[in-house]
């Protein structure tokens, strides 16, 4: 495990007006925004070093990407400080919601594709990218596609997280869901309603260990599930 250096100030960008970010989210008609220059330069450098050096990528998925999880080694003082700083700087968004799970995925686009369409069990989903832009071969792609129709409250986690993609597509079509496609950018965060269905956009990154696309996800709060009678 890479031992991260202590960050001298906030892990999230200390020069950004975070009150404006909160207002942008609350005024967004779809609860989908992106935040450029999300982490401080110091924090993103250390977090990237942690991801490159630490042997925490211990789960392989069908689409050939790897996962690392907070309860299986993907954790450091920086990981936790990011959550603390989010609560401090964006109290209206995160203050009342407990940090749930957080994880990272690493993709080799020569082997497979990204994550299939799904939703997550939380209130807010914060997803950010830490692989430098120089490795992304398609500058207007490689990011995240978010559909502005939340998973039904009476669907179980297994149903909206592992369901057949055809059934989700039918649900989105029936509900006239619009897709917001946020292109990949280094140190860009995407914040959205975690009940929204989302999937990885087409990825095309340069071959090589350091060039693999890495995204990190933090979940805040618990989504209410409607009990069946």
Go through each PLM region and give its residues.
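Fe(II)/2-oxoglutarate oxygenase catalytic core
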Residues: 1-189, 195-229
